[in-house]
Amino acid sequence: MALYTIGEVALLCDINPVTLRAWQRRYGLLKPQRTDGGHRLFNDADIDRIREIKRWIDNGVQVSKVKMLLSNENVDVQNGWRDQQETLLTYLQSGNLHSLRTWIKERGQDYPAQTLTTHLFIPLRRRLQCQQPTLQALLAILDGVLINYIAICLASARKKQGKDALVVGWNIQDTTRLWLEGWIASQQGWRIDVLAHSLNQLRPELFEGRTLLVWCGENRTSAQQQQLTSWQEQGHDIFPLGI
């Protein structure tokens, strides 16, 4: 029977080891074996279970309810992510930044960056993106807390083995998405730095020797896609980002 370390499982299942530990310790979702030295070992059944957990979470189920679902108990799973958006909005409206940071940090331990970005942060940020001054202020607070949290995550990820990459925005307006995309990439094995401002004209030769991960917004233009392909054919280490 094959056994896998937590690092190997993280790569196989595309999930952060911190999240795997949280699923085990806080929620009792996993029961890995242990070596004599105390290191976790997972078998193929564990990997199947992890993938099933991810499927439930991606469908909007809160982590705290997944264990009952795995036990075939009846659970109300409707509107899970909408509920989490409302919780986050309540923290924003309270003005208590410490509680807001703590809540986001806990979610970051419980869920993969891709899942949180897709189902929580992007939808709520869209709700706040309007001309109403109060909502604009809440969005500014949220973005500041997110960037601060993600910067800490990226700094921690850079201490691990991986390939260095620079996240670059190409002709975009929403620079917070650069940080969210960089966070996702960091959980896929990249050691990420983020170029803080979007570039209207991207010139890969200015970043010679660097791997560039390029965010063009949610819908790349055909011209951008053609140019990215051309740069790759010229030997530039450049790849598009996107959920």
UniProtKB/Swiss-Prot annotation:
Activity is regulated by DgcM and PdeR. GO terms for molecular function: DNA binding; DNA-binding transcription factor activity. Residues 6-25 bind DNA. Disulfide bonds: none annotated. InterPro entries: DNA-bd_dom_put_sf, MerR-type_HTH_dom, MerR_fam, MlrA-like_C, MlrA-like_helical, MlrA-like_HTH. Pfam families: MerR_1, MlrA_C, MlrA_helical. Residues 3-72 form the HTH merR-type domain. One of its GO terms (biological process) is regulation of DNA-templated transcription. Disruption phenotype: Knockout mutant no longer produces curli, is mannose-resistant haemagglutination (MRHA) negative and produces smooth white colonies on Congo red agar. SUPFAM superfamilies: Putative DNA-binding domain (SSF46955). Keywords: Activator, DNA-binding, Transcription, Transcription regulation. Signal peptide: none annotated. Activates transcription of csgD, the master regulator of biofilm formation, by binding to its promoter region. Also controls the transcription of cadC and ibaG. Part of a signaling cascade that regulates curli biosynthesis. The cascade is composed of two c-di-GMP control modules, in which c-di-GMP controlled by the DgcE/PdeH pair (module I) regulates the activity of the DgcM/PdeR pair (module II), which in turn regulates activity of the transcription factor MlrA. NCBIfam families: PRK15043.1 (NF011617). Interacts with DgcM and PdeR. This is HTH-type transcriptional regulator MlrA.
